[in-house]
Amino acid sequence: MSWDQVWIDVNLATMDPSVSAPYGAITNAAIAVKDGKIAWLGPRSELPAFDVLSIPVYRGKGGWITPGLIDAHTHLIFAGNRANEFELRLQGASYEDIARAGGGIISTVKACREADEAELFELGRQRLNALAKEGVTTVEIKSGYGLDTETELKILRVARELGKHHHVDVKTTFLGAHAIPPEYKDNSDSYVDLIINKMLPAVIAENLADAVDVFCENIAFNLEQTERVLSAAKAAGLEIKLHAEQLTNMGGSALAARLGAKSVDHIEYLDEAGVKALSESGTCAVLLPGAFYFLRETQKPPIDLLRQYGVPMVLASDFNPGSSPICSTLLMLNMGCTLFRLTPEEALTGLTLNAAKALGIEDTVGSLVVGKQADFCLWDIATPAQLAYSYGVNPCKDVVKNGKLVHQ
């Protein structure tokens, strides 16, 4: 056989639903790569003969290979920090209190409007490096810290540039409807007009976004405004997603499901009717335990109902300066289990196959299947559950991206 590389002495957590074992596991396995794709995988005993003198062979020393991790919800590009708000919350102020007083997202908006692209790029590069060291091979990055046309475009341009200069694939999301900017505080409908009539066409003209998101909440955009933005995005051929049911149940998830959204994110206050709507539309539920933890929330997402209705559950970092300043997907695995009572297998599925579904890329990444992109990680672990069980020492030993060894 003619391959570009072969990995032996490994166990595979394929996350392939067609493999009946937990995690889609194949033990005592091998995996071969050709032209950036998975060319063969299976038990080592069935590995076809190949020229060991001309093909690089990597020995995994009994470790586990998983698909590359996918962080499907981040706000990774921003300037400044909000440590002062952290102190205020510890003194009793709520997320809503801070937002209504002009803090929260708006304070980061000010910093991003003042920062240039070079500064934002370097900050984003450092954060993307941190995720990459934990085995992330694909990341979603949202805008939303500009809230004017110029700065929203600036953030999205930086995200696109990061994707061009980093081995991690970057999917971009336009989140102009993240908050009401101060200049539109008393006229939010006019800001929605600006998003639809000026921002969105400019984003599309430069091909800066793969999807459009809205923060549907009582401190942000109401249902009617949310539908206007998402409908305009859908009409323009972009994928849609939604921040919903984080602080209250406004029915945003049902709206998103009706419009065919790829995902609904946060969903702490999602009810059974909303879960049923997600199930019927095939919309993913993105769980963000970092924000739940950092905001010291008590209302948990309806995990049992999501299981009952078969809604794909995704885990993501929600990395951002205000509600989840936690740049770690491995910690999300642990939090998903300890805070939301996911099983370790559900948690890992949420950072691989289901995360790919939330981004609409499950045909190319998210599981180890012949023909899919060769994005995978070798972990120094005895069992896949160990990724969620223990945190603090990074067990990621090697990362292969598009068939190339990028971290060793």
Swiss-Prot record:
The UniProt record gives the binding positions of N-formimidoyl-L-glutamate as Y145, N320, G322
For this UniProt entry, what's an example GO CC term? Answer: cytoplasm
- Give the record's keywords alphabetically: Cytoplasm, Histidine metabolism, Hydrolase, Iron, Metal-binding, Zinc
> What is the annotated localization of this protein?
Cytoplasm
Q: Which residues bind Fe(3+)?
A: H73, H75, H243, D318
Residues that coordinate or bind Zn(2+): H73, H75, H243, D318
Give the Enzyme Commission number.
3.5.2.7
What GO molecular function terms would the record report?
A: imidazolonepropionase activity; iron ion binding; zinc ion binding
Q: Which family does it belong to?
A: Belongs to the metallo-dependent hydrolases superfamily. HutI family.
Q: In what pathway does it function?
A: Amino-acid degradation; L-histidine degradation into L-glutamate; N-formimidoyl-L-glutamate from L-histidine: step 3/3
What class does this enzyme belong to in the EC scheme? hydrolase
**Residues binding 4-imidazolone-5-propanoate:** R82, Y145, H178, Q246, S323
Q: Which InterPro entries match?
A: Amidohydro-rel (IPR006680), HutI (IPR005920), Metal-dep_hydrolase_composite (IPR011059), Metal_Hydrolase (IPR032466)
| Reaction it catalyzes | 4-imidazolone-5-propanoate + H2O = N-formimidoyl-L-glutamate
Please state what the protein is called: Imidazolonepropionase
Reported cofactor(s):
Zn(2+); Fe(3+)
Q: How is the cofactor bound?
A: Binds 1 zinc or iron ion per subunit.
Any one GO BP annotation for this protein: L-histidine catabolic process to glutamate and formamide
Q: Which HAMAP family match?
A: HutI
